[in-house]
Amino acid sequence: MTKDIAERLMSCYSGAIFDALREKGITNCVLPPEIAPLDPSKKMAGEAFTVSGHLDLNMDPHETLLRWTDFLSKAPSGSVVVCQPNDHTIAHMGELSAETLHFKGVNGYVVDGGTRDSAFILNLGFPVFARYKTPRDVVGAWVPDSFGEDIKIGEVNISNGDYVFGDLDGVLIIPSSEAQSTVDRVEEVMSTENLVRKAILQGVDPREAYLSYGLF
């Protein structure tokens, strides 16, 4: 069976992916470095399911939870949820929500905002990438208001269906139209890097290794 793009990306790492995108002239693809993995050992890859929302401190708590759980119901299996909350004051992910997404087969969650219940999420093993941690939650405070629409995090535009990859070094967005050729090139780059590594460990001068293999 042929591996899909997300599965192949899980064998890659962000540095090689960026190098392949840079060769294509795509450099505005890395989310702000403040967005970091809750668990540094976790990777994630999948097609983006985009979400945006807004802070509203006058919302009825019941209504906020209805709209939040509606969002959880919409998240597709195999996707990576990418959320632009337009807010940097509360947590936009927590234990029960992570449990729900994990059970549904969602591959990870990226938010230009916060998370909470960190110990529980770490124990669950669900990949969450966020700017910060706080115990404040969405109840009576925040609601999602669009799904599957274009969003922007930092200077990076993200469309539903673009590919998302995250590891210890950060999160990259791969345009859907470039995903197949990018992962093909990443696998070539990693294979060549193995040859460079072997040469260096055999005592080859780094400049000579670069000239021989064309990368470093």
Over which residues does each language-model region extend?
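Acidic, glycine-rich flexible loop/linker segments
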Residues: K133-A209
